Regions:
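Active-site proximal beta-strand in glycosyltransferases
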Residues: 64-65, 85-108
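Nucleotide donor/acceptor-binding cores
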Residues: 13-15, 93, 187-191
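Donor nucleotide-sugar binding/catalytic pocket of nucleotide-sugar-dependent glycosyltransferases
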Residues: 132-149, 153-175, 190, 194
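N-terminal pre-catalytic "stem/leader" segment of glycosyltransferase-like enzymes
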Residues: 1-75, 217
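Conserved catalytic-core segment of nucleotide-activated headgroup transferases in glycan assembly
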Residues: 22-37, 162-228
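Membrane-proximal helix-turn-helix segments that form the acceptor-binding/catalytic region
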Residues: 84, 116-137
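Short, flexible/disordered intra-domain loops and linkers
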Residues: 77-79, 107-118, 198-213
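Acceptor-binding helix/loop patch of EC 2.4 sugar-transfer enzymes
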Residues: 97-124, 167, 172, 176, ...
Length: 228
């Protein structure tokens, strides 16, 4: 009998796992949206979640395990266990540590409302050790790449910028609307800051000397010229 060929030959897709640290901005920009788009466009088979699975058979066929901002002792033990699994002959995955912010206490500004999460010296120690254990670290820009090379000694650090998903922003582009807005507001252009409240001294810890301190006077002087 002739060899039976499958009706549809599926292409080989790289398999990967994402372990999230959060489901908010960082989680979406760096993990969830890229995972969604890679799956939707058939570029890879990526699964994501927060449960660290202890059955090593689950990791067979996986090419990359990407962990986001892991820093606790339990998470360190999990990475050590993964490194032991990685060394076995049936496994060929790489472990990538994803970080898009500073997590070492000495470099986090005092006005940052979320600094308390990294005050414990154990957090610094465990996050440092995890980054040193990982095969690669991914960051958002060249500054952070150089920063973490200096801090951790891990030189295999890759810059992956943040990209806005087209399904979110692309449909809002309207050239006629842009021209209309320009004509309407050109006498007093609008300047908008879009970002986290962590850049502001919300709790007045250091008398408002935050990321906007150096431009406050400019804003005061130009409040009639620009709509801030």
């Amino acid at each position: 009998t002739p060899n039976k060929q499958p009706a549809h030959e599926l292409p080989h897709l790289p398999r990967a796992l994402n372990f999230y640290a959060d489901y908010s901005g960082c989680g979406h920009w760096r993990m969830i949206w890229p995972e969604l788009l890679l799956n939707c466009f058939g570029k890879a088979n990526v699964q994501g979640g927060t449960v660290m699975i202890g059955d090593k058979n689950f990791y067979k066929g996986i090419e990359t395990i990407r962990i986001q901002r892991q820093a606790t002792e339990q998470q360190l033990n999990y990475i050590k266990w993964l490194k032991n699994v990685q060394a076995e002959k049936d496994f060929n995955f790489r472990i990538v540590y994803e970080i898009d912010d500073l997590i070492f206490r000495e470099d986090i500004p005092d006005y940052n409302k979320f600094k308390f999460a990294f005050e414990d010296p154990k957090i610094r120690q465990t996050s440092m050790e995890i980054m040193q254990l990982c095969d690669e670290v991914s960051v958002t820009n060249e500054y952070m790449r150089n920063y973490y090379i200096e801090k951790t000694g891990n030189k295999n650090i890759t810059v992956i910028p943040n990209f806005i998903p087209r399904f979110w922003m692309d449909r809002f582009f309207d050239l006629d609307k842009i021209k209309e807005n320009f004509q309407r507001f050109k006498r007093k252009p609008r300047i908008v800051y879009c970002g986290s409240g962590a850049h502001f001294d919300i709790e007045n810890r250091i008398k408002q000397k935050d990321d906007f301190f150096h431009v406050n006077e400019v804003i005061r002087k130009t409040v009639d010229k620009f709509q801030w």
